[in-house]
Amino acid sequence: MNDASSSTYLNGRIEYQQALDTVIEHARHSLRIFDYDLRDGGYNAVQRYERFKRFLLASSKNRLLIVLHRVDYIKRDCPRMLNLLREHSDAIFIHQTNAEARVASNPLLIADDAHYVHRFHYEQPRAEWVLNDLALTQPFLQRFDEIWQASTLAVAPTTIGL
């Protein structure tokens, strides 16, 4: 892995999804995702599922934290993500924002406190992709933590019905 810091601006959905894949590949310990509903990031694609699975199998200490404004899409249309949640229920946590965090509108994917993809607004494809920069990543870590604190567990690894 190259240790030089790099920053790239992205203007389209394909570039955005490719940047997400690259940042996920750089993850060694933690992945933090904040998104409106995961619909635009290719999160149900086979390749994304495989990347997450490799990350989670690399170490039992690896963690995937996801915060969404809306969870209906993941529950209804993301069977691969739900499969991962069932298989790695000790490592994946999917939260939904509370009212105070619903103003957040800039999706994030952060890997290991040093790499991120920051979409400027969930309705627009423009984004920034940064690798190997702890200083630039720090404000986004703080923002993610604020959103995480203003959220609650929303998607369980099992469905219990009568």
Language-model features and meaning:
Residues M1-R32, Y36-L162:
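PLD/PLD-like phosphodiesterase catalytic module centered on the HKD motif
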